[in-house]
């Protein structure tokens, strides 16, 4: 019933090819039509999910495949896209059965089809990004009035100090005996959370400034997913000893892929984000495949993916703190680029900045920070997204002040998430990354709702 309704709406959907300004000039109002089309698409997705489960990436890969084949008319795409989606899903289902039989002696379950579908879809999107040039659109950033940046920094630092104080004791009073008992177990995890928050927040400030996308975050580059994929390869090849080298190799692979495809588009912000999302989806599907395989080693990957801080080691904590300190010291070197690059390539070149070199350097810096934080606490989400917005909400408008405030807020978010995860379900612990994502999801929805 829903499919014929979608075909009926096809004529009205042809209006979407015209800009909203032109439609308003003609007196047409497509708000009701857009709402109806979205409702039909949502109902179709609900029926499919309720019937066979979550199937990812088919809705994105099928239209992209049709566009790549040169099919342009809406009527032809409405017929060809479902056929392409059916072929993709049939191939994924066949691959699931073949792999399950081939690995029957190593895995205990049949591989889910929904886990396999993003793998060819992500590879297809990467191929299309390689073949096509994405035009550069200068990032649009609203002019924000500089409202007393010093109080914003003070508030952020006070919040960080209070969160750290409570992390070493659930009260503000701590005797010498209690401190001696708690210090060895608490300081590595608190320092790890603090350092990871600083690195993710600084990376988020750079990405949002570079792309002009308020929803940009370190996870959008695919570095975290690449590190996770490297951890899986390390587990399969060398056990625990190869985890670090595998994570580093995976993060470097993700960064290299983003750089290679981004270089073809002169490091246009849109190409960087799309490449990161595509590789992140591809690597995330492989990680899910490992977790769903039933391999006992998958529990290590599952625990790492939750963003735990309770496994922090002193040496790893000190290493992360050193990298975070270097990031804070090197961040002022990029302030001129962060002020000029949002103006666009032509204006940046006129002001003496080489955009390609500047963007490559900034992306390499972000990749290092994201990779180190991922090694420390796993793929923590929302910290790099929320911290820059909290800084801007307090009046930190310039890149320099915003970076300082965001670093303090990023550290505060993860330190408080670690503290709350330790107390909410005592004596059990909730990983800080999972709790940060749980608390950050409403903020993310609010941010989407207020964005224009």
Q: For each predicted feature, which ranges?
A:
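Alpha-helical transmembrane segments in inner-membrane proteins
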Residues: 1-452
């Amino acid at each position: 019933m829903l499919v014929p309704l979608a075909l009926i709406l096809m004529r009205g959907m042809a209006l979407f090819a015209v800009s909203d300004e032109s439609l308003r000039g003609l007196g047409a109002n497509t708000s009701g039509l857009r709402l109806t089309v979205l409702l039909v698409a949502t109902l179709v997705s609900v029926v499919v999910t309720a019937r066979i489960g979550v199937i990812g990436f088919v809705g994105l890969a099928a239209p992209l495949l049709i566009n790549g084949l040169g099919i342009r008319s809406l009527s032809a795409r409405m017929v060809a896209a479902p056929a392409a989606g059916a072929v993709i899903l049939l191939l994924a289902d066949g691959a699931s059965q073949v792999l399950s039989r081939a690995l029957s002696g190593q895995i205990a379950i049949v591989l889910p089809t929904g886990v396999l579908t993003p793998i060819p879809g992500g590879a297809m999107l990467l191929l299309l990004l390689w073949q096509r040039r994405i035009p550069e659109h200068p990032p649009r950033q609203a002019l924000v009035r500089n409202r007393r940046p010093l109080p914003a920094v003070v508030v952020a630092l006070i919040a960080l100090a209070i969160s750290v104080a409570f992390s070493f004791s659930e009260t503000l009073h701590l005797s010498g005996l209690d401190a001696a008992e708690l210090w060895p177990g608490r300081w590595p995890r608190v320092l790890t959370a603090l350092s990871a928050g600083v690195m993710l927040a600084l990376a988020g400030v750079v990405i949002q400034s570079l792309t002009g996308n308020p929803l940009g975050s370190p996870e959008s580059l695919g570095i975290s997913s690449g590190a996770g994929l490297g951890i899986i390869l390390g587990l399969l090849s060398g056990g625990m000893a190869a985890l670090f080298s595998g994570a580093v190799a995976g993060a470097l692979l993700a960064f290299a892929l983003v750089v290679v495809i981004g270089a073809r588009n002169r490091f246009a912000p849109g190409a960087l984000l799309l490449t990161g999302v595509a590789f992140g989806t591809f690597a995330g599907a492989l990680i899910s495949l490992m977790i769903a395989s039933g391999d006992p080693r998958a529990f290590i990957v599952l625990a790492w993916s939750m963003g735990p801080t309770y496994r922090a080691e002193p040496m790893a904590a000190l290493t992360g703190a050193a990298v975070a300190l270097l990031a804070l010291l090197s961040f002022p070197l990029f302030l001129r680029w962060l002020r000029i690059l949002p103006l666009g390539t032509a204006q940046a070149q006129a002001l003496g900045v080489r955009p390609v070199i500047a963007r490559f350097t900034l992306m390499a810096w972000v990749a290092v920070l994201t990779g180190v934080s991922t090694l420390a606490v796993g793929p923590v989400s929302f910290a790099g997204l929320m911290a820059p917005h909290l800084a801007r909400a307090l009046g930190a408008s310039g890149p320099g002040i915003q970076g300082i405030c965001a670093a303090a807020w990023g550290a505060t978010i993860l330190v408080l998430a670690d503290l709350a995860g330790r107390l909410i379900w005592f004596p059990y612990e909730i990983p800080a990354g999972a709790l940060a994502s749980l608390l950050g999801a409403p903020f993310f929805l609010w941010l989407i709702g207020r964005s224009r």
